[in-house]
Amino acid sequence: MFLRLIDDNGIVLNSILWLLVMIFFFVLAMTFIKLIQLCFTCHYFFSRTLYQPVYKIFLAYQDYMQIAPVPAEVLNV
């Protein structure tokens, strides 16, 4: 009975603890969502700045290194 103004049977403390738990899970969910958004942003950035130019260079190299097929006259020896 020390420092008790109302006999609430712990409902205020229980409500405060549940509120803290809900805030913790809310912050955790927001962090997870922001992490996923960061992954999509990084993927978009690298796709535009790294993957597409490297792929274009690879296609140019592949076109440059293309070997012409052997003519049919050479095979009829």
UniProtKB/Swiss-Prot annotation:
GO terms for cellular component: host cell Golgi membrane; membrane. One of its GO terms (biological process) is viral budding from Golgi membrane. Residues 37-77 are intravirion. The chain crosses the membrane at residues 16-36. It is a single-pass type III membrane protein. Disulfide bonds: none annotated. Pfam families: CoV_E (PF02723). The keyword Transmembrane applies. Its main location: host cell. InterPro entries: E_protein_aCoV, E_protein_CoV. Keywords: Apoptosis, Host Golgi apparatus, Host membrane, Membrane, Transmembrane, Transmembrane helix. It is found in: Host Golgi apparatus membrane. Residues 1-15 are virion surface. Plays a central role in virus morphogenesis and assembly. Acts as a viroporin and self-assembles in host membranes forming pentameric protein-lipid pores that allow ion transport. Also plays a role in the induction of apoptosis. Homopentamer. Interacts with membrane protein M in the budding compartment of the host cell, which is located between endoplasmic reticulum and the Golgi complex. Interacts with Nucleoprotein. Belongs to the alphacoronaviruses E protein family. HAMAP family: ALPHA_CORONA_E. This is Envelope small membrane protein.
